């Protein structure tokens, strides 16, 4: 069902059973999958790609130009939204800065009202971005991560798989998988509730705890400590190894720290 007041460019491709509300705008070369809902006044900018069963609520803007003073508007880049993602009112998701680049939102994400996802970000699957949170450019968010309301994440930061960040936190350093981040670049432990809800066994959780204490209990360099843990042979579960590998994989080498 397409409302007669909606503006849809002739080159846009819409799947089956797509609903487009009043005064919505769908620009050139947009691709929208089956059973999507584009609400009144939503704007899908040129080249954006939406999977199946995506909901874009009122006044959201998908695929706008990056807020980068060096960006050339003639650059061909886009935004890709995974299946079954919900994008609520006034959300903004900007396209990538480089030629052929893509800002990627995974599947089954829930992006709440007023959240902002900047250029070149990449979110995994089952990510929740709560009201008013802000991801700077090139931020990477792992599967099942929860970014609470009002959180500001600095460009190029990594939010690890299953991590949770408390409301109004300021994050300018990487948050490890399953970590509980808060305040300004602080970590208070592990997201035990989230791990249990996702069905991780007690044995796996215990090994992640051991890895956490190996890296964070002593005062030292997180990267060197993670390397020593991996060399020790004491960690065997994929989840614990993923936690430790995280410290070796970043470009910035800076991580949230306990108080």
State each model region's role.
Residues 1-186:
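Structural signal for interior beta-strand "rungs" in well-ordered beta-sheet cores
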């Amino acid at each position: 069902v397409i409302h007669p007041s909606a503006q849809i460019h002739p080159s846009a491709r819409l799947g089956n059973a797509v609903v487009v509300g009043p005064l919505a705008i769908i620009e050139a070369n947009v691709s929208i999958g089956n059973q999507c809902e584009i609400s009144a006044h939503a704007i899908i900018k040129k080249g954006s790609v939406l999977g199946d069963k995506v909901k874009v609520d009122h006044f959201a803007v998908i695929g706008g130009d990056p807020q980068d003073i060096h960006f050339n508007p003639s650059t061909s880049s886009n935004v890709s939204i995974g299946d079954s993602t919900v994008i609520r009112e006034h959300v903004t998701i900007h396209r990538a800065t480089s030629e052929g680049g893509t800002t990627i939102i995974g599947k089954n994400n829930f992006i709440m009202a007023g959240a902002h996802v900047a250029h070149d970000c990449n979110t995994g699957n089952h990510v929740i971005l709560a009201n008013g949170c802000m991801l700077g450019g090139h931020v990477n968010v792992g599967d099942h991560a929860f970014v609470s309301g009002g959180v500001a994440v600095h460009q190029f930061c990594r939010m690890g798989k299953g991590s949770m960040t408390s409301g109004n936190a300021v994050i300018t350093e990487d948050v490890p998988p399953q970590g509980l981040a808060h305040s300004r670049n602080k970590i208070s432990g592990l997201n035990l509730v989230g791990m249990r809800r996702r069905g991780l066994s007690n044995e796996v959780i215990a090994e992640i705890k051991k890895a956490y204490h190996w890296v964070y209990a002593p005062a030292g360099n997180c990267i060197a400590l993670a390397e020593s843990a991996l060399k020790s042979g004491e960690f065997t579960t994929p989840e614990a190894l993923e936690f430790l590998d995280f410290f070796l994989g970043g470009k910035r080498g800076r991580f949230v720290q306990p108080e």
